[in-house]
Amino acid sequence: MSADEDNKEQVLKECEQAEEIMKDKQNQKLISEITKENIQLKEEIKKLEAELQETTRTSQINEDIPETKIKFTSVENPESDSEFSDISYSCQVSSKVPYELQKGQALITFEKEEVAQNVIRMEYHHVQVQNENVMLTANPVSLNSGVKFQVHVGVSKMKINVTDIPDELPESQMRDKLELSFSKSRNGGGEVEYVEYNKQTRSALITFVESGVADKILKMKDYPLYINQNCHRVTVYPYTETHLKKFQVFSGVSKRTVLLTGLKHLQTTDEEVVEDFISIHFQREKNGGGEVEVVKCSLGQPHTAYFEE
């Protein structure tokens, strides 16, 4: 009986071990499947996030615009539809004018122009810097030349640029192929008015008859071009025209900034401390000053300050 019971216990143990091994294998398989599903889900999430970003980039932003009174003046007849359908914007660009601040000098900028001019008229100023009494001389700041201009950019709603065109056909045939390809509505195209093709640069300018076609194509970033049963993806991007207007060169004297000299022989080398004492002195009306915007001094290496018109 004892031997039979031992055999039974041995068999039970082996069965339990076999079950545990099976369970481990099943668990490992389940973990592997879950891991695989997680990887797939992460990839799907990345794709959805990319699509969401693209949708956000291309979609319009709705924003409340304050009411504006508009006065009707006249009716204009545009020479072409593109005159009113194109997008245009402009910006003003002004260069910063550098000024080199030498050792022993300081620049002080006041809020009001008349304060700066008064400080210059007084010319000499006794300023207490820690335990030293310093005689500073106020001078106007003469600036080098700078430039300013307007940049006008127009984005066409009727034209698109095409690049990366394969060099597989003669010029006239490729021009016809481009016109045919971009006129296919199933690919987002429309009726083509004109194709300007450059074989050397492998690029083209496509002009459509109707506005709106260019927008649809540009959202795709590339476009299918079939040549000899082969599909090539050509790159598309907006056609823009840029013009510079009202280019001007300016120079002169800063109206609110004053050059102070006489700091060369100061014992202290802490520029921030000196700047604080100068600011405190020139903020007082009894010293001929007023509200100070900024002070910058040089006690060691020269500094470069930048002025805008």
UniProtKB/Swiss-Prot annotation:
GO terms for biological process: innate immune response; macrophage activation involved in immune response; negative regulation of cell population proliferation; negative regulation of innate immune response; negative regulation of non-canonical NF-kappaB signal transduction; positive regulation of inflammatory response; positive regulation of innate immune response; positive regulation of non-canonical NF-kappaB signal transduction. There is a cross-link at residue 23 (Glycyl lysine isopeptide (Lys-Gly) (interchain with G-Cter in ubiquitin)). One of its GO terms (cellular component) is cytoplasm. InterPro entries: Nmi/IFP35_dom, Nmi/IFP35_N, Nucleotide-bd_a/b_plait_sf. Residues 23-65 form a coiled coil. Its main location: cytoplasm. Keywords: Coiled coil, Cytoplasm, Immunity, Innate immunity, Isopeptide bond, Nucleus, Secreted, Ubl conjugation. Acts as a signaling pathway regulator involved in innate immune system response. In response to interleukin 2/IL2 and interferon IFN-gamma/IFNG, interacts with signal transducer and activator of transcription/STAT which activate the transcription of downstream genes involved in a multitude of signals for development and homeostasis. Enhances the recruitment of CBP/p300 coactivators to STAT1 and STAT5, resulting in increased STAT1- and STAT5-dependent transcription. Belongs to the NMI family. This is N-myc-interactor. The lineage of its organism: Eukaryota, Metazoa, Chordata, Craniata, Vertebrata. The gene is NMI.
